[in-house]
């Protein structure tokens, strides 16, 4: 009887699991090819908080094709989808930088292929900008929560060659977007 109850319990547990939904890359012809100065654009889909479903799409004006969820297909050995809450995406040089806020990292990819180059850990990162071979990213420097004792936020400097954090400066609570003005 114990064996029957154990098997019944195991069967119920396995039957209650939800199927894992994985978004595959999709190519969609949306327009005729265009000869413009802008070759295309990347679109960061943030996904729902807690679902690890941020994705990157690319609209290629030269072919008229829209590439949906290109990161997962370009990186089959990585965890599917990009992470939890895509917050910002920028191009600098031949690299693509995606700030994945709740997953606490900046994903660095090859600009043409979206293949993973490295991941830069940064707690509750928000936005990124660039100047003279350096990336500057904002961070809340603490978990995503309502906490009256939350730490002060910071801005980090990342070398775009080594892809390592080289400096950081505490700036106050919840720094978000940032701009570089007149070489300062």
Segments from the language model and where they lie:
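Predominantly soluble domains enriched in secretory-pathway, periplasmic, or organellar proteins
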Residues: 17-184
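Sec-dependent signal peptide recognition
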Residues: 1-7
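C-terminal motif of bacterial Sec signal peptides marking the signal peptidase cleavage site
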Residues: 12-15
């Amino acid at each position: 009887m114990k064996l029957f109850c154990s098997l019944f319990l195991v069967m119920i547990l396995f039957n209650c699991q939800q199927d894992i939904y994985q978004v595959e890359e999709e190519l969609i012809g949306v327009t005729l090819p265009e000869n413009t100065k802008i070759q295309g654009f990347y679109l960061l889909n943030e996904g729902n908080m807690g679902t690890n479903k941020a994705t990157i799409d690319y609209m290629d004006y030269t072919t008229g094709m829209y590439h949906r969820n290109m990161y997962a297909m370009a990186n089959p050995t990585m965890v599917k989808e990009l992470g939890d809450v895509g917050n910002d995406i920028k191009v600098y040089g031949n690299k693509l930088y995606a700030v994945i806020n709740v997953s606490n990292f900046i994903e660095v990819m090859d600009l043409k292929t979206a293949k993973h180059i490295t991941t830069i850990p940064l707690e509750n990162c928000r936005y990124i900008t660039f100047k003279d071979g350096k990336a500057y990213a904002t961070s809340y420097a603490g978990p995503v929560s309502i906490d009256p004792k939350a730490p002060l936020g910071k801005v980090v400097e990342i070398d775009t060659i080594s892809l390592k954090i080289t400096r950081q400066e505490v700036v106050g609570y919840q720094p978000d977007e940032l701009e570089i003005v007149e070489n300062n």
